């Protein structure tokens, strides 16, 4: 296993090889020290937002193959040795040259805030006058909320005058007060919990009291009316508006206005409540209102209970009991804004907490579950139940490639997909089983059969794990799984009991086109009508089969179950046997036609990302260590014998060669460029709306890839170019919008059902009545390049 270690600034990146999932963090630090020359005590390692601490393993942090760990180097503190040196290192802030405040200055307010707080009541008493302003104490007015621009019913409780600024002379107090200098202290009728609010004179006016009749409304008239910007068909708050048009029919009356929302406005809004249009009262025109006036109807503050005080509501009242009593004993959660009685909590509180912030039990973060920097990880219940956690064996099981985990996942088809995987031709080769899992051809890392006992088998691996297997290329006899003691963390064992037709054995039997029979087996009369099974041959099968690949794993196409039956195997126990026969249009990779096709497509062995670099580093280290040993022997006149009477022998190749190493072939195979069929080229030319995208894709055919086949490079380019912005998959039933973006029809339908009528990629307004037409040329090309990719979508 290998990983990447990168410094925080991104300047240095090194591959750390020869690791295990059970490698300790302190061991990793020593390897990093050899590469980065940083002491372990100065290393801070971060992975997925967590600081890695000693005592844990890579498995504890779930570090996977070729993942990147960030390295932050601690700076060693060097204290000044003399007073002169210490004085020279003073910052600009300490020496008084800094323009901003120092930390001590920032923490000190110099008495400014306190003076402002202490002097405010004195100033208000000094400038409190009863003869100021147009509106007097206890008069009913309309006050405007400066945030939303709506007018609310309020009552004046106090009138004051602004204190003179420092630039004005003190004699200005004797001049008559202007309306702009007046401050009104008002209290909202519907929101007494807000207390007394100070308002400028421009945000206060006489209470609206006159309803304008329909026949008196005129275009261009400025009035006050009810409107809801969020839900125009429901009752909202009261806004100023200018009437833009008016229309009356035999059955309805329509009124449109430009609604003023503070500094902004909404144009041509249809007004629902045309019988509740109020005249704006001008200052000094009417008599002041001191009696209880008629109340206007506004939208309910709670849409759940419609402000019904007799109804329990868990939205606007206590979230637990729904009661409205004891508002002074309610706490508001700073996260969800829900109210809670202190005696409804579990456990209940005796008093309101003095903290500024409070969170309800559903929103608060459990401090015991938070892992701070420098703390050890919490014990995982899931990992505590694993066999590796309870095993007393000291074997390092974390070095195998089956333990590293997938770095990516096949999503172009679902996991229960029958038949070929789109974009994976017959003859595709992978070095490790985990890569086969990532491609989607055979998803289990270790198991030989992938399937479900109530559905069927989707794929299997022919690896020679059972001595009863017989391989003839186009057909083979396969042995079921089970009958072995794999307790603990074992990968394989000898046959120790009879197999049963359950689990994956039953799944593979369901692929046979015959009724299931768990006693005697069954044989299909029409075996081609059975469910397809993807077959992968492994290099381990080469001990019993000449059709196995020379290295790694190879996809050999589609096979179908002809029959299955129980019999006593070579081990003496009952095993289930399956006869599978090849049913694939693509030639087998061991035939001459198959080899020519592999050469034409340029299919080569695929290695995990970073594998070749790690292997090269490992061989380089071996060569360096070998050279050092030879130099030491030559310098010390050592005997060429190494060990007990054994002579050291150099290989003819100049160094040890590793079986299965990608460096053993020096001759490069000439790769033919991939070319489209005449039908595919015609369909691409027909898709004129995506001509620019196709030009970019076709340009990739001219590029010669450094690794991989041109065919797979072309498919990956197509998949990247025609990816749906919504589902992040290859577009299916594509809709090419007028703004030249491709979206799945199902994704666009879902967007329209959510009342979003714009392009998901660029927000271009498509309109409610947009006609969705599937781009058939594009869909046909994608079906030919990725056959079956629409299954399950």
UniProtKB/Swiss-Prot annotation:
One of its GO terms (biological process) is protein autoubiquitination. Residues 1-78 form the Ubiquitin-like domain. Residues 82-124, 618-673 are annotated as: Disordered. Residues 618-629 have a biased composition (Basic and acidic residues). Pfam families: PHD, SAD_SRA, TTD, ubiquitin. Changing residue 145 to A: Impaired binding to histone H3. The tudor-like regions specifically recognize and bind histone H3 unmethylated at 'Arg-2' (H3R2me0), while the PHD-type zinc finger specifically recognizes and binds histone H3 trimethylated at 'Lys-9' (H3K9me3). The tudor-like regions simultaneously recognizes H3K9me3 through a conserved aromatic cage in the first tudor-like subdomain and unmodified H3K4 (H3K4me0) within a groove between the tandem subdomains. Multidomain protein that acts as a key epigenetic regulator by bridging DNA methylation and chromatin modification. Specifically recognizes and binds hemimethylated DNA at replication forks via its YDG domain and recruits DNMT1 methyltransferase to ensure faithful propagation of the DNA methylation patterns through DNA replication. This is E3 ubiquitin-protein ligase UHRF1.
């Amino acid at each position: 296993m290998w990983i990447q270690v990168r410094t925080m600034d991104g300047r240095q990146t090194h591959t750390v090889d020869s690791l295990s999932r059970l490698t300790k963090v302190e061991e990793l630090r020593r390897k990093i020290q050899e590469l980065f020359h940083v002491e372990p005590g100065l290393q801070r390692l971060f992975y997925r937002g967590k600081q890695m601490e000693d005592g844990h393993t890579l498995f504890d942090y779930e570090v996977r193959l070729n993942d990147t760990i960030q390295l932050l180097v601690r700076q060693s503190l060097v204290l000044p040795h003399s007073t002169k040196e210490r004085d020279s290192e003073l910052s600009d802030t300490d020496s008084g040259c800094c323009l901003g405040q120092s930390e001590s200055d920032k923490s000190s307010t110099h008495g400014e805030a306190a003076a402002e707080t202490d002097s405010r009541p004195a100033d208000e008493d000094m400038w409190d006058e009863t003869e100021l302003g147009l509106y007097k104490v206890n008069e009913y007015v309309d006050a405007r909320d400066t945030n939303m621009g709506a007018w609310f019913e309020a009552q004046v409780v106090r009138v004051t005058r602004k204190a003179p600024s420092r630039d004005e002379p003190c004699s200005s107090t004797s001049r008559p007060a202007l309306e702009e200098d007046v401050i009104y202290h008002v209290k909202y009728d519907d929101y007494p919990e807000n207390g007394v609010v100070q308002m400028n004179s421009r945000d206060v006016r006489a209470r609206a009291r006159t309803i304008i009749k329909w026949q008196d409304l005129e275009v261009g008239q400025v009035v006050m009316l009810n409107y809801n910007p969020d839900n125009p068909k429901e009752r909202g708050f009261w806004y100023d508006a200018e009437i833009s048009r008016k229309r009356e029919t035999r059955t309805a009356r329509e009124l449109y206005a430009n609604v003023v929302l503070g500094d902004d406005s909404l144009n041509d809004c249809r007004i629902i409540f045309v019988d509740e249009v109020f005249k704006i009262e001008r200052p000094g025109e009417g008599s002041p209102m001191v009696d209880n006036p008629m109340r206007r109807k506004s939208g309910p503050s709670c849409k759940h209970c419609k402000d019904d005080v007799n109804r329990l509501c868990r939205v606007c009242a206590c979230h637990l009991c729904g009661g409205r009593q004891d508002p002074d004993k309610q706490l508001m959660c700073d996260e969800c804004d829900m109210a809670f009685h202190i005696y409804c909590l579990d456990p209940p509180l005796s008093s309101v907490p003095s903290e500024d912030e409070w969170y309800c039990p559903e929103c608060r973060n459990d401090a015991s579950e938070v892992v701070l920097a420098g703390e050890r990880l919490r014990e995982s219940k899931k990992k505590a139940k694993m066999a590796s956690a309870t095993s007393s064996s000291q074997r390092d099981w974390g070095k195998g490639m089956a333990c590293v985990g997938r770095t990516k996942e096949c999503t172009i088809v679902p996991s229960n997909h029958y038949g070929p995987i789109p974009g994976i031709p017959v003859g595709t080769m992978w070095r490790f089983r985990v890569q086969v899992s990532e491609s989607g051809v055979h998803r289990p890392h270790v198991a030989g059969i992938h399937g479900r006992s109530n559905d069927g088998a989707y794929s299997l691996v022919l690896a020679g794990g059972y001595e009863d297997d017989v391989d003839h290329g186009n057909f083979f006899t396969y042995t079921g799984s089970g009958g072995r003691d794999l307790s603990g963390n074992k990968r394989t064992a000898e046959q120790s009991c009879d197999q049963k037709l359950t689990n994956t054995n039953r799944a593979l039997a369901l692929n046979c086109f015959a009724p299931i029979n768990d006693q005697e087996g069954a044989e299909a009369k029409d075996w081609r009508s059975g469910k397809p099974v993807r077959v992968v041959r492994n290099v381990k099968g080469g001990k019993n089969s000449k059709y196995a690949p020379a290295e790694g794993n190879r996809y050999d196409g589609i096979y179908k179950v002809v029959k299955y039956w129980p019999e006593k195997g070579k081990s003496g126990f009952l095993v289930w046997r399956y006869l599978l026969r090849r049913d694939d249009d693509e030639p087998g990779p061991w035939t001459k036609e198959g080899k020519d096709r592999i050469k034409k497509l340029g299919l080569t062995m695929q290695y995990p990302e970073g594998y070749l670099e790690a292997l090269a580093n490992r061989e380089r280290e071996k060569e360096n260590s070998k050279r050092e040993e030879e130099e030491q022997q030559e310098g010390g006149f050592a005997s060429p014998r190494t060990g007990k009477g054994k002579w050291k022998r150099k290989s003819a190749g100049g160094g040890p060669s590793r079986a299965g190493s990608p460096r053993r072939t020096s001759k490069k195979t000439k790769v033919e460029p991939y070319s489209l069929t005449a039908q595919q080229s015609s369909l691409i030319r027909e898709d004129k709306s995506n001509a620019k995208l196709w030009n970019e894709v076709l340009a990739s055919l001219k590029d010669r890839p450094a690794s991989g086949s041109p065919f797979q490079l072309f498919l990956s380019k197509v998949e990247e170019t025609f990816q749906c912005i919504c589902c992040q998959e290859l577009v299916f039933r594509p809709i090419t919008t007028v703004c030249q973006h491709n979206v799945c029809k199902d994704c666009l339908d879902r967007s329209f059902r959510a009342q979003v009528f714009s392009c998901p990629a660029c927000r271009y307004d498509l309109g409610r009545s947009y006609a969705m037409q599937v781009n058939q040329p594009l869909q046909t090309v994608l079906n030919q390049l990725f056959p079956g990719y629409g299954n399950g979508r």
